Amino acid sequence: MPAVLGFEGSANKIGVGVVRDGTVLANPRRTYVTAPGTGFLPGDTARHHRAVILDLLQEALAEAGLTSKDIDCIAFTKGPGMGAPLASVAVVARTVAQLWNKPLLGVNHCIGHIEMGRLITGAVNPTVLYVSGGNTQVISYSEHRYRIFGETIDIAVGNCLDRFARVLKISNDPSPGYNIEQMAKRGKKLVELPYTVKGMDVSFSGILSFIEDAAQRMLATGECTPEDLCFSLQETVFAMLVEITERAMAHCGSKEALIVGGVGCNLRLQEMMGTMCQERGAQLFATDERFCVDNGAMIAQAGWEMFQAGHRTPLKDSAITQRYRTDEVEVTWRD
């Protein structure tokens, strides 16, 4: 019954998780929060991660009721993500692996989300909608790869929402996306915004540029409220995501859809995806913020699968990479 310790820190969340044979034993997390109207810089984020990571490690072991002797493998996020935060966490993972004399595993962040989603929901072979601040992909498993059927051709949907939040100076606590979701519930008017779907791919830069340019003017003239803009942006970008996911499901003949990534916590997105799945006679799987948002347990779970399949990452190959596509990884642990 191997136990795997996972380190995640590819963006403004840092987490340390422990997983043993499909059971999450611990999953503490911290978030680097900046002032309204601002984003988070790589260097500042890395400093935050370095300041809290050892406390999180101790917290995870205590919560799991384990010691270093009980851990069989150390997993960490190899990429994709922001360079400085990734590097700061990878250094700790390598150090711990050497001090404890444990094997090391570099995990693809995207695959961590997928494997955690499969574990928590019980989805068998779903079409995956992976939506976060740095990634937007529609994925399906085939022949030992997670194949990307569609994706953003510019910025991620979460990045679009985060940057819009800066325009309205919406709070980043607990996250701009969550606060947009709450404001959208009070929106009453649907403002027409650019809708850009190109086959299986989507584009969010145009809708962001439009709303950045028009927001203050529309608010000043009383044409709409901030809540209306939040509502309109959500409805438009989520409709785009539902469209390309349905197209992928039709192509694959899939009867399961799984939403993963931080934006996947959004209940309105889950509602729209659920309606689409119901109309197709399919089933929707999603998790709550404990497992949708970046966390250490997802890296531990993917690491556990890789460890069981015989994967190891030599120290010389453990450098982080900011660009690490989902379909680069050979998924040897699935049939």
From Swiss-Prot:
Q: What tissues harbor this protein?
A: Widely expressed at low level. Expressed at intermediate level in lung. Weakly expressed in testis, skeletal muscle, kidney, liver, spleen, brain and heart.
UniProt-listed CDD domains: ASKHA_NBD_OSGEP_like_euk
Q: Which cofactor does it need?
A: a divalent metal cation
* UniProt-annotated binding residues for substrate: Y130, V131, S132, G133, G134, D162, G177, E181, N266
- The EC category is transferase
Tell me what reaction this enzyme catalyses: L-threonylcarbamoyladenylate + adenosine(37) in tRNA = N(6)-L-threonylcarbamoyladenosine(37) in tRNA + AMP + H(+)
Q: Tell me yes or no: is Hydrolase among this UniProt entry's keywords.
A: no
This entry carries the following GO cellular component terms, namely:
cytoplasm; EKC/KEOPS complex; nucleus
Gene3D superfamilies per the record?
3.30.420.40
Please tell me where a divalent metal cation binds in this chain: H109, H113, Y130, D294
Per UniProt, which keywords does this protein have?
A: Acyltransferase, Cytoplasm, Metal-binding, Nucleus, Transferase, tRNA processing
Record function comment: Component of the EKC/KEOPS complex that is required for the formation of a threonylcarbamoyl group on adenosine at position 37 (t(6)A37) in tRNAs that read codons beginning with adenine. The complex is probably involved in the transfer of the threonylcarbamoyl moiety of threonylcarbamoyl-AMP (TC-AMP) to the N6 group of A37. OSGEP likely plays a direct catalytic role in this reaction, but requires other protein(s) of the complex to fulfill this activity.
Q: Which family does it belong to?
A: Belongs to the KAE1 / TsaD family.
| Stored PANTHER family | TRNA N6-ADENOSINE THREONYLCARBAMOYLTRANSFERASE
Question: Which HAMAP family does the annotation name?
Answer: Kae1
What this protein is called in its record is tRNA N6-adenosine threonylcarbamoyltransferase
Q: Which organism is it from?
A: Mus musculus
Gene name on record?
Osgep
